[in-house]
Amino acid sequence: MLEALKPAEGATFTYIKGRLIKQQAAVENPILPFPIFFLIKQNKVFLIKSFQSSQKCEFCGDFFANSHTCSVRRRDFYFHHINFKSSEWWSQISFQPIGSCDDTKRFFLTYDVETYTWHGKHGKQLVPFMLVFHLSGELELVSLSANIAEQQRWLAWDTPHTYYYVSPIKGEIGKAFKDLRYEIQKQVTRLLWDNFVGENPELAEIQERHHVNHIDDITAEMHKIKTKGSPQFIEIYVIGHNICGFDEIVLAAQVIHNRTDVLPAFKINRNFMPRNGKILFNDISFCLPNPKYEKRKDFADWECGKLTAADHKYQFVKFMVRDTFALTHTSLRNAAGAYELPVEKGSCPYEAVNEFYRIGSYQQDEDGFPSLRYWKSSEEYQLNKALWREKNVGAYDIIQQTLHYCVQDVLVTSALVNKLQESYKNFIASQVNLPDASFNIFQRPTISSNSHAIFKQILYREVRPNKANLDNVLLAPSHEMYDYVRQSIRGGRCYPTYIGIMEQPIYVYDICGMYASALTHPFPSGQPLNPYERALAATEWIRKLENLEQKIDYFDECLLPGIFTIDADPPDELFLDELPPFCSRKGGRLCWANEPLRGEVATSIDLITLHNRGWAVRILPDERTTIFPEWKCVAKEYVQLNIGAKEKADKEKNQTMRSIAKLLSNALYGSFATKLDNKKIVFSDQLEASASKTIARGNFSIKSSSFIETDNFSAEIMPEFVVTYPPAPSAELDESDENEEHTLFIPKDSHVTYKYKPITFLETEDDDICLHTLENNSPLIENNRYASHIASFVLAWTRVFVSEWAEFLYAEDRGKPLHQRTIKSVYGDTDSLFVTEEGHRLMEQRGKHRIKKNGGKLVFDPKNPSITWLVECETQCEKCKSDAFSSESVFLAPKLYALKNTVCTCCGHVGKGKLRAKGHATTELCYDTLAKCYLSDAQQGSQRFHTSRLSLKRTLATNQSNAAPFTVTETTLTRTVRPWKDKTLVDIDGHRLMPYSKSNPNPRNNDVCWMTLPWNM
């Protein structure tokens, strides 16, 4: 059009999704003396009369000509919902009450396996030869499962509903267990379907309308009708102790079988999540519509933790794998003791069993009992031999004895399951004051996930948001903000400041419930401020930080909580000490150093800590800088409930309640620090349509694929045969042919030599045994579950505790060179400090109010805000419980040290010492060995020290050729014991170590720093 009109100047403006796209027209030989401009909007063409320049408000996104006024509400809305980048930075955290429906039917299949070592192509692989299981829970489901077990010829034990199977054939145990679980799954889902069909006769009309042969063939898409009847909720738990890291892996190739004969009417949801060599989730749900489902409008029940049948969109049968180890974090014997369960004495010589299956025999003593070498000690050998003689069962049958102990473990685990369920339900009802919640501890797989759910429930009850999320009280950082917040999470300190043998007395002080105390302190809450309000709040921070002479109060009401990008410079080295207030990863390793900090991400608490320790802190401009509108003690009630329950349990001698309160108190911090990634592992047949579309669009890619080793499946081996284009069959030889002389065979150029091998047909589909690792092509992580910034502030509060501790020890040394100061501490762990006699004296004097035995608070009081933490002397006398010290100690490296003994300061009793050797077999080490190791290294001796231990390599999904998915292999791990070589501190005199500083910088730090040279200014 413009070409036809030929104006002096012409252009077309197209309005698309809030943007104007200009297309300039090139006009040759113009006729009209004036310009013409068109606007295309919503498929309509407008003639532009005139242009007027406008401006866009960077805070609210509005356009204006001359002047403009925007409100805080509009700025917040634009920042959190409109701006294409910041609108994805913070997500609301979804909420569901911790309770479950009262009508839920639960069935538990508790099992354990025993294995022997099989030498295969992937190394020493552990193969199950025995499996025992016990049935408990809903009587109808127990009876059904018992009938299935008997039909499949599982052998019954003397205890009711207890069955076992023994076979050394590789793969047979797993196949039998798979068949059992599969048949239970099939029959229980049939129960749900029959009930659904009986209460919905309209399904017969759907069958006729869609010309379906049988009502069982109706698909989920067909029965989208308004259903009737009472929903059923059935949960089936496959449970064992420490099975997710072992038993479920060696059986998984058999039991993870997804292509089943499940009726097409069911909607199937699967949740399979391997993590850190363990199967964290292996759940599958078979769902049908819930006729009572209603979208909730009144959330009063949710505040009480109550979940009703109307809250579930589907009625279901759920199959879940749960591990009692993930809920107790200790061995089965210790867990039984903690929850006051009876445990039979004795143990099994598993190495003898292993030899029996491997070579057919094992060493025996003169009575036919397994030799002493199979037992941990002579005492264990004598005890078990005495128990065997008491039973008077004749000759020692190693398989029968193994079966007996396996059955006992299963029965103890089953009793533990019942105890955990009842105890946690009572704890939530009485201690958390949620009697209507009907809490089920096995609904979530780990103690961390349960603690997080309880925390959210308590917070939801307090804030009452009246919606299905926590509103803006607590948000989750996502996308770019997730990575930014994760940069502010700094691990705990762990390093010695003295290497060698220390002949001075050493006391060990430990912070009491460090994370629990930190969690009671205030944390940032509310929707982060928009850039305009953020700049105003940051100005107040800058003003306070510029005054280096004035310390800042941690609870200054003028300063809002936030996360900043900072530079910081330390004071003169004479005013530094061995406990730096902050750490950095700039050199590739986490170092607690007194070096200048550049471009570090830190919480507002860290800014105050650095400032109060004499550091000059500068806030750097960063669009990701986050400032929150208020402080709030979001976790105080949760921690206070657990501390109160623990103290009450101590008074009442209730070991069960004490164990629960202690576990829940310690587990919450870890849930906030959960690290997410962009990967997920699925079986090939689990790729739903939505996942396939994301792969097709390029949003996800298949990072790797691997197959479960086929040896684990049952198979039929066919004789040799040719599949395609076989060579022509040879004609029968006649007599004349037999007498002919054989001539030299010269092959043709095109000749191929065929070697025919047996073909094995597996009883499985390829999709069932193929694992895909899917990875999001975007590096940004979507998070709507965890308030990760809470973990940052928890760790920041713990650094405040240690910073105050440093003041007790080192304040009097300010102004002295570091190498001339008296040694006051020699080792620092995350929540403990090893101090000398001088350090102990200062703790008793300057830090007296922080020692637990002198009284003090563990829970922060918002009405009288002050830093709240306590310590106690961990080295105590075994007899009188007074403070004790180690007369001699040796420190080799982080988490590698030994205290020779503990000498009581009151009664003089000499007790046993303490040894820590992470990654080593501690049974092979003692104080003298570590001391010899140090002396040999210091004197450049030739003696070398090693420890060896058996290690289990767990493989779930891999693209490595030397490892098969779903296998556990046994390897011998040998490690060298030696003093610290790659130190992250400066060696002063061969013994003392000091943090890096300006005069002794970190040699690993190769970051480039741009600066202007003075002569170029």
UniProtKB/Swiss-Prot annotation:
GO cellular component, one term: host cell nucleus
Function (record text): Eukaryotic-type DNA polymerase involved in viral genomic replication. DNA synthesis is protein primed, and acts in a strand displacement replication. Assembles in complex with viral pTP, DBP, host NFIA and host POU2F1/OCT1 on viral origin of replication. The polymerase covalently transfers dCMP onto pTP, thereby initiating complementary strand synthesis.
The species this protein was found in: Bovine adenovirus 2 (BAdV-2)
Record protein name field: DNA polymerase
Enzyme type, top EC level: transferase
Domain of life: Viruses
Compartments, record wording: Host nucleus
Gene from which this protein is expressed: POL
Classification via Gene3D superfamilies: Helix hairpin bin (1.10.287.690), Palm domain of DNA polymerase (3.90.1600.10), TPR 1 domain of DNA polymerase (3.30.1770.10)
GO BP annotation list: DNA-templated DNA replication; viral DNA genome replication
Note: This DNA polymerase requires a protein as a primer.
Subunit structure: Heterodimer with the terminal protein; this heterodimer binds to bp 9 to 18 of the genome. Forms a complex with viral pTP, DBP and hosts NFIA and POU2F1/OCT1 for initiation of replication.
